[in-house]
Each structure stands twice: as structure tokens, then as C-alpha cells.
């Protein structure tokens, strides 16, 4: 057994999972958690893995990517998924938990492991030696300053401003056209043209749609030069037509005329299966958001794989900074995990902690860190956050659009998703003993 100790900073979902995975591999862990010595604006207890928003870990079925990632984690002995299964409450096809029982169970499993030493103190600098940083979206100001210093100001962010992303297969290609503004460069955008009547209908729905209430500590984010589309719209109809929906230079090749307004979609992944809606960062609730977006010509039946969000979220530019092992490129023994890496969601955060923990343990034991292939859900997330376009990087949930394409094209969505799941689980079984 190695005498080296791994520092894990943060006992949220990712940090708790990472600590457990390291400890069960015979490596000593120092798990640092500043609560209750210093609380965050969102937490209320001193328990590990406290769920601060919903009590749902989302879909549990294998026809959904987050269901697949859960099953992969079960096979890899995830402490988070084990605790969730033990504390589950009725939720249809989803996995929801009694949040207090869940946090208590995770705390018990991790804290009581003989290889884990818990340190209730705030870390304000990045430690020497093997370390996993899993401090989450509300990282303390002092540590944030050190991380900003480490990564560089251009690669460290304090809030999400993510536009919605849709599956290409769900776009009505008969209503859109491929073109770049003024035909500059290659035709890179799918354009959804609107008549004045269609724009008016869209505009009225947008300004009437219900938004997510801002938390006190989020109120400054809209003044950082990234305005929600509904806030722009509230300043008058023409704000959008002269802003993100401006039609100039985007003549419709079918009519030869310039539409009244245009919504542009930009390819979001290397495989070309996902498109984001340019300039549509939003604070709308998800139900109204879907209704508004489906008023856009060509998106009437759009499958939204990530909804637009704007909220406080400390994260790094992982494509520039991390390897798919969750290692920092400039320092082999420094790992990042959780929402800080750009994975979005409870389960995805825990999954990143699982892989970072395994790799930290392997590193101190003299073994090569593992890269999970992108045919798996966990591997596809690691691949996305480290290989996607760094310039437009924003956090992402697990979805089948991130998986490596199937060898054989399957038209029916349910059958296609089943094939993704079967391939992922067959592959992950080769890694259960790492």
C-alpha cells in the first residue's frame, strides 16, 4: 500500500465520490470540507453531498443518457448511486431521494472509511502533492482567486450563460437553410427564417414566459456583458431584430429575400449531431422555454438536450486545461472534478469524481490513469469537456448526442438509444476492476 496521501477538496457529490474511490483502492485520503466552519450561500448543513436544488437524480431508464451513466456508476461501485438507491422515494421512471437521508448515508459511508481523514477547514490555496479540486459552483472567494491565478483569467468563469442545444435530427431541415452571414467563409450556420407575423408571435410568447427567480448571490451576473434573450426582448421588439436575430446578410436562398428575423443554429459537437441556438442564453423556466423555442420555424419538434441557463457557477475552461483523465495538463498530480469541470448535474458531477478518484489512486500507485472511451456515458462526458470547442465552452448534461456515433445508423429514436446503452454497458464492464 502506498504511503502517499491524496487531498480531496470539497465533500460534495464529486468530492465524496472521489474520496471513496481512492480510499477503497487502499490509498489514504485527506478530505477537506469547509462546512460548517464556513457555509456557502446555498448549503444548510454540514453533511456531505448535500443536494441544494432538486431531490431528483433524473431518469433511471436506459433509454436516457443519464440513466446509462447511473448504471455505469453502479457497475463501478459508486457510493453516490448506492446511497441514492438506498434512499430512493417514488418518482416514476426517475431516481429521486430523501435528501436528508441521502446526505447522511453518503457522509456515513465516506467518513467511516478507515482510509479517509476528514478535515473541517477552509482551503485557500492549492496544496502540493496529489490533489483533487471538487469545490463546486460556489467555490470560496479565496480559493477562486488562487484557481484564477493558476488557470489564467481567460479560462476561469463565475457564471453559466448557456444557450439551448437541440438534436440535429429533430430540426425540420425543409424550413431552415445553411448559410454564413454575407457568405463569409464556409456555410456554417443553420438559419431559421421568420416572417414578421412569426416574429410577433415568438416575441409576445418570449416576454410573457415565466423566468427562474434569481437567488441573491446571482443578481450581479447579468451585468457582465451577457444578457438573457428575454431581458433584451423586454427593451423593445427591435432589440432582437438588431441583436441576436438580425437578418442582414442572411438572404433565404428559396426566396432570394431577406427574412424579417433569423434565428441561427451553430454546430456544437464534432460529430454534427448537436446545434446550439446562437445568442439565446436565457433564464426562462424549462417548460416555457420549450414552448417559446418551438415557435421558431424548423424547431417545432425540436429535442432539447440542454436548456438555456444563467446562474452562478464557478467553472474552468476544461478543453484548454484538462485531459480526459480529469488531470490538469500542466501538473500531473492535480485533478479537477464536479461542476467545476463543466459537467452539469448531480449525476454527471459524481461520475467525474468517480473517474478522477480512480485516476488519482492509480497515479500514486504507479499505474497509468484511465481514459474511458466515448462509447460510454462517462467517457463521452470526459471527452466532451476536454475536446469540444474551447472558445464557446459551456457546461453540459449527459446526452446521447455526446456519445461516439453508432456504426450502423438507426432511425427510430428509442431503438437508437437502446443501442447506445447496450454498447456503453458492454464496454464499461471491461473497466469494473480498474
From Swiss-Prot:
Its main location: cytoplasm. It catalyses: uridine(54) in tRNA + (6R)-5,10-methylene-5,6,7,8-tetrahydrofolate + NADH + H(+) = 5-methyluridine(54) in tRNA + (6S)-5,6,7,8-tetrahydrofolate + NAD(+); uridine(54) in tRNA + (6R)-5,10-methylene-5,6,7,8-tetrahydrofolate + NADPH + H(+) = 5-methyluridine(54) in tRNA + (6S)-5,6,7,8-tetrahydrofolate + NADP(+). Its cofactor is FAD. InterPro entries: FAD/NAD-bd_sf (IPR036188), MnmG-rel (IPR002218), MnmG-rel_CS (IPR020595), MnmG_N (IPR040131), TrmFO (IPR004417). FAD binds at residues 10-15. It is found in: Cytoplasm. One of its GO terms (molecular function) is flavin adenine dinucleotide binding. It comes from the Bacteria. Keywords: Cytoplasm, FAD, Flavoprotein, Methyltransferase, NAD, NADP, Transferase, tRNA processing. Pfam families: GIDA. Belongs to the MnmG family. TrmFO subfamily. Catalyzes the folate-dependent formation of 5-methyl-uridine at position 54 (M-5-U54) in all tRNAs. This is Methylenetetrahydrofolate--tRNA-(uracil-5-)-methyltransferase TrmFO. It comes from Bacillus cereus (strain B4264). The lineage of its organism: Bacteria, Bacillati, Bacillota, Bacilli, Bacillales.
Amino acid at each position: 500500500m502506498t504511503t502517499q496521501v491524496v487531498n480531496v477538496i470539497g465533500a460534495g457529490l464529486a468530492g465524496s465520490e472521489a474520496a471513496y474511490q481512492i480510499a477503497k483502492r487502499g490509498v489514504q485520503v485527506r478530505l477537506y470540507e469547509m462546512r460548517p466552519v464556513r457555509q456557502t450561500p446555498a448549503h444548510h448543513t454540514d453533511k456531505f453531498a448535500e443536494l441544494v436544488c432538486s431531490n431528483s437524480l433524473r431518469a433511471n431508464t436506459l433509454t436516457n443518457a443519464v440513466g446509462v451513466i447511473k448504471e455505469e456508476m453502479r457497475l463501478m461501485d459508486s457510493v453516490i448511486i448506492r446511497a441514492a438507491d438506498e434512499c430512493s422515494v417514488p418518482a416514476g421512471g426517475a431516481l429521486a431521494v430523501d435528501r436528508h437521508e441521502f446526505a447522511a448515508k453518503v457522509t456515513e459511508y465516506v467518513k467511516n472509511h478507515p482510509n479517509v481523514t476528514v478535515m473541517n477547514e477552509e482551503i485557500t490555496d492549492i496544496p502540493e502533492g496529489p490533489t483533487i479540486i471538487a469545490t463546486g459552483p460556489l467555490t470560496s472567494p479565496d480559493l477562486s482567486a488562487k484557481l484564477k491565478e493558476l488557470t489564467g483569467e481567460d479560462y476561469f468563469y463565475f457564471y453559466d450563460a448557456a444557450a439551448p442545444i437541440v438534436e440535429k435530427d429533430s430540426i425540420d431541415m425543409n424550413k431552415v437553410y445553411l448559410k454564413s452571414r454575407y457568405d463569409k467563409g464556409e456555410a456554417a450556420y443553420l438559419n431559421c427564417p421568420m416572417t414578421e407575423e412569426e416574429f410577433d408571435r415568438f416575441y409576445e410568447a418570449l416576454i410573457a414566459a415565466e423566468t427562474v427567480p434569481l437567488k441573491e448571490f446571482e443578481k450581479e451576473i447579468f451585468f457582465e456583458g451577457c444578457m438573457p434573450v428575454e431581458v433584451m426582448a423586454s427593451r423593445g421588439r427591435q432589440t432582437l431584430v438588431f441583436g441576436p436575430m438580425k437578418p442582414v446578410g442572411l438572404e433565404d436562398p428559396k426566396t432570394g429575400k431577406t427574412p424579417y428575423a433569423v434565428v441561427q443554429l451553430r454546430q456544437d459537437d464534432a460529430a454534427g449531431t448537436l446545434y446550439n441556438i446562437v445568442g439565446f442564453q436565457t433564464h426562462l423556466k424549462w417548460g416555457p422555454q420549450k414552448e417559446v423555442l418551438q415557435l421558431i420555424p424548423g424547431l417545432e419538434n425540436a429535442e432539447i438536450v440542454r436548456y438555456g441557463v444563467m446562474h452562478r457557477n464557478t467553472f474552468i475552461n476544461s478543453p484548454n486545461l484538462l485531459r480526459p483523465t480529469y488531470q490538469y495538463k500542466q501538473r500531473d498530480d492535480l485533478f479537477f472534478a464536479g461542476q467545476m469541470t463543466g459537467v452539469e448535474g448531480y449525476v454527471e458531477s459524481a461520475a467525474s469524481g468517480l473517474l478522477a478518484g480512480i485516476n488519482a489512486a492509480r497515479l500514486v500507485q504507479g499505474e497509468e490513469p484511465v481514459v474511458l472511451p466515448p462509447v460510454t456515458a462517462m467517457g463521452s462526458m470526459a471527452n466532451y469537456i476536454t475536446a469540444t470547442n474551447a472558445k464557446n465552452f459551456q457546461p453540459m448534461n449527459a446526452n446521447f448526442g455526446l456519445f461516439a456515433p453508432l456504426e450502423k445508423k438507426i432511425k427510430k429514436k428509442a431503438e437508437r438509444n437502446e443501442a447506445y446503452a447496450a454498447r456503453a454497458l458492454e464496454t464499461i464492464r471491461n473497466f469494473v476492476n480498474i
